[in-house]
Amino acid sequence: PSITFKFMVLASPSAEYITSDYVKVHIQREYARACPGGTGRAKTGGNYAGSLKASMEANKLGFHQTLWLDTLHKESIEELSGMNFFAVLDGVVHTPKLTETILDGITRRCLIKIAQNLGYEIKESHMKISELLKQIEDKSCTECFMCGTASIIVPIAELCETDGTSYSLTYSKGQVAKQLRETLLGIQEGRLEDTEAWVTTLL
């Protein structure tokens, strides 16, 4: 590997990452995105490369994103191909606890802080996919959403298996997600007070 490098910052406008009003997510039970001992927690190009095959297959089946499970047991929810995962269970906001295979996303951090400031209880834990699907069916899980720099927050309408089994969320367009999104955008755009000193003014 090279012993020198050049640090560059590119600023460019971008279109919306996901434009659909009804987002369907494929539960990936075959492939693995990141393995223990690797670079799964880092923001590297290689992590995206590992998800491309599954993402292309999911797109062909009509899905917008892929939900990845842990590599070893395919039981614990990790993240989506380019975004972190959240779910609202009985009014409590849940997100997978960070591991060496889950990205410590900056948008994830911001949303946790915003949710706490808005009075929501936050739980970071190892979320089992089997338990979540049961909670969606019994309506104790009312919404799921994903977040990232490009997309900010995207509500999930359905979680789907390869065999066609689908699990529809009560709030397919988000409720808590909408509140968190509007708050974060308000801070970014200067309409709401930036109490966390997240925004830097460039002159």
Task: Locate each region found by the language model.
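Helix-start/capping segments and mature chain N-termini
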Residues: P1-L203
